[in-house]
């Protein structure tokens, strides 16, 4: 019979919906070969098939977004940030499991310890925008948080990564994330939590920082 190969970004979805695991198992049981991108996905796959033909291949570094080769100063001019600011970047679709609320709650302490720091939150909020805006007001960090809401087209990605000093992924759960590989493409360090496959692709103290979730 025809051999079927699955490339699994996630074996199981981050956000649950009725019958998701049942349907996932029914589909993946038909596979002959699998490519997964984290050890967590590999482990999840073994819950479905006892002997899958599986290859673990982490995300490659993404260089495709370096369209203009913007310098740090050029990119900061585009996002209206000064050369002296310490820029933190949270990038991508904002979802509950990505832990943005933890980063916002930590910002008052970060502001105390890091002079001239600003957090850029860049991405689509979906239906959850109001709770994050309220948290920003509650913590009185409006001046230190820049929200750029909406889908970011490929040509706009570069200016945010080229301008930042650190990319932050305070996730509560994850198998892996392409955001890390985008950051690496711009030679930017990342801060990730010890969840899923994120620690697999970050060398603590060298390519970034790995912290408790």
Where are these regions (language model features)?
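Nucleotide-activated donor-binding/catalytic signature segment of Leloir-type glycosyltransferases, i.e.
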Residues: 132-151, 155
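Acidic donor-binding loop of glycosyltransferase active sites
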Residues: 159-177, 188
């Amino acid at each position: 019979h025809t051999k079927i190969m699955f490339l699994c970004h996630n074996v199981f979805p981050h956000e649950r919906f009725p019958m998701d695991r049942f349907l996932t198992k029914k589909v993946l049981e038909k596979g002959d070969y699998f490519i997964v991108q984290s050890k967590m996905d590999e482990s999840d796959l073994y819950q479905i098939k006892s002997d899958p033909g599986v290859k673990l291949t982490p995300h490659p570094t993404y260089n495709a977004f370096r369209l203009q080769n913007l310098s740090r100063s050029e990119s900061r001019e585009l996002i209206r940030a000064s050369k002296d600011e310490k820029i933190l970047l949270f990038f991508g679709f904002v979802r509950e499991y990505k832990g943005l609320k933890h980063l916002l709650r930590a910002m008052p302490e970060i502001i105390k310890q890091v002079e001239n720091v600003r957090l850029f939150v860049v991405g689509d909020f979906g239906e959850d925008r109001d709770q994050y805006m309220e948290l920003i007001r509650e913590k009185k960090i409006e001046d230190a948080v820049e929200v750029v809401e909406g889908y970011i087209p490929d040509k706009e990605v570069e200016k945010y990564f080229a301008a930042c000093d650190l990319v932050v992924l305070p996730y509560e759960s994850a198998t892996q994330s392409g955001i890390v590989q985008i950051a690496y493409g711009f030679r930017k360090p990342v801060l990730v939590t010890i969840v899923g496959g994120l620690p697999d692709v970050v060398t603590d103290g060298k390519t970034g920082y790995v912290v408790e979730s």
